[in-house]
From Swiss-Prot:
Name of this protein: Transcription factor HES-5
Pfam family, one: HLH
Superkingdom, taxonomy of origin: Eukaryota
Subunit structure and binding partners: Transcription repression requires formation of a complex with a corepressor protein of the Groucho/TLE family.
Taxonomic placement: Eukaryota, Metazoa, Chordata, Craniata, Vertebrata
Domain Orange: 88-119
The keyword DNA-binding appears for this protein: yes
GO biological process: astrocyte differentiation; BMP signaling pathway; brain development; camera-type eye development; cartilage development; cell adhesion; cell maturation; central nervous system myelination
GO cellular component: nucleus
Location of the bHLH domain: 16-72
Length: 166
């Protein structure tokens, strides 16, 4: 065994803690400095706009991060809460754009052309969506009989050549 290990093993717990404390403190400071550096990189554009050509201290970086978060939170609150219908529409539009982009990247086949034509048609008018009164609650599915749902599904399939799950 090395002499240093024997000496450490013979120390009391209080003495071990006294020796370990500077190492733990250095690790903590390194974590803090690393996080501040990451904040600086994330908010680099914000810093350039407010304080160009200045050396930023750690306190400046933290203050700027706090003000940026407050500003973005206030901006989100000013935009107002979105309804479930808006969220659904935005998600659907994004998904549709991704699908069209994917289809246009590859060589055009007959099926791809039909899909592109189908996606680019204007959507049929949708039934109004009822929102739940409590925020954060899951939307309740519409109650209908299976025969009515099946007849609507078959009429939609026969109306257009492509099957759609909606």
């Amino acid at each position: 065994m090395a002499p240093s290990t024997v000496a450490v093993e013979m120390l009391s717990p209080k003495e071990k803690n006294r020796l370990r404390k500077p190492v733990v403190e250095k690790m903590r400071r390194d974590r803090i400095n690393s996080s501040i550096e990451q904040l600086k990189l994330l908010l680099e554009q914000e810093f350039a706009r407010h304080q160009p050509n200045s050396k930023l201290e750690k306190a400046d970086i933290l203050e700027m991060a706090v003000s940026y978060l407050k500003h973005s939170k206030a901006f989100a609150a000013a935009a107002g809460p979105k309804s479930l219908h808006q969220d659904y529409s935005e998600g659907y539009s994004w998904c549709l754009q991704e699908a069209v982009q994917f289809l246009t990247l590859h060589a055009a086949s007959d099926t791809q052309m039909k899909l592109l034509y189908h996606f680019q048609r204007p959507p049929a008018p949708a039934a109004p969506v009822k929102e739940t009164p409590t925020p954060g609650a899951a939307p309740q599915p519409a109650r209908s009989s299976t025969k009515a749902a099946a007849s609507v599904s078959t009429s939609r399939q026969s109306a257009c050549g492509l099957w759609r799950p909606w």
